[in-house]
């Protein structure tokens, strides 16, 4: 069966539009997912390990799992962070002043 030129154009446009919608939905849902977590600003002298030490000691979380989660969710290519960088960490926001530890794995 040979498709007409109009049919080919329709299928092509439909595919492009559907792909765009799927990409937008996946981007929006991942952004909303991260909105439930605490965001911190990196200070002078901070490292991923020093931040992990602060959180892991008080929340009984494995430091390696913490660093892996932070690197993944913040799309870090290296462990280098700079003052002023904003990082999402695995502490879920409960409300303005209270937080609970998120599941890291």
Swiss-Prot record:
GO terms for cellular component: cytoplasm. CDD domains: LysM (cd00118). InterPro entries: Cell_div_suppressor_YneA, LysM_dom, LysM_dom_sf. Keywords: Cell cycle, Cell division, Cytoplasm, DNA damage, DNA repair, Septation, SOS response. Residues 38-89 form the LysM domain. It comes from the Bacteria. The keyword Membrane does not apply. It is found in: Cytoplasm. The keyword DNA damage applies. Transmembrane segments: none annotated. Induction: Repressed by LexA. GO terms for biological process: division septum assembly; DNA repair; negative regulation of cell division; SOS response. PROSITE patterns: LYSM (PS51782). Inhibits cell division during the SOS response. Affects a later stage of the cell division protein assembly, after the assembly of the Z ring, by probably suppressing recruitment of FtsL and/or DivIC to the division machinery. Belongs to the YneA family. NCBIfam families: PRK14125.1 (NF010723). This is Cell division suppressor protein YneA. The gene is yneA.
């Amino acid at each position: 069966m040979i498709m007409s030129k109009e049919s080919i154009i329709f299928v092509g446009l439909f595919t492009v539009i559907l792909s765009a919608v799927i990409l937008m939905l996946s981007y929006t849902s991942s952004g909303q997912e991260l909105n439930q977590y605490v965001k911190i600003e990196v200070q002078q002298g901070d490292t991923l390990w020093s931040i992990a030490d602060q959180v892991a000691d008080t929340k009984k979380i494995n430091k390696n799992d913490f660093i892996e989660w932070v690197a993944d969710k913040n799309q870090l290519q290296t462990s280098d962070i700079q003052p002023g960088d904003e990082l999402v960490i695995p502490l879920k926001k409960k409300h303005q002043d209270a937080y609970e530890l998120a599941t890291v794995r």
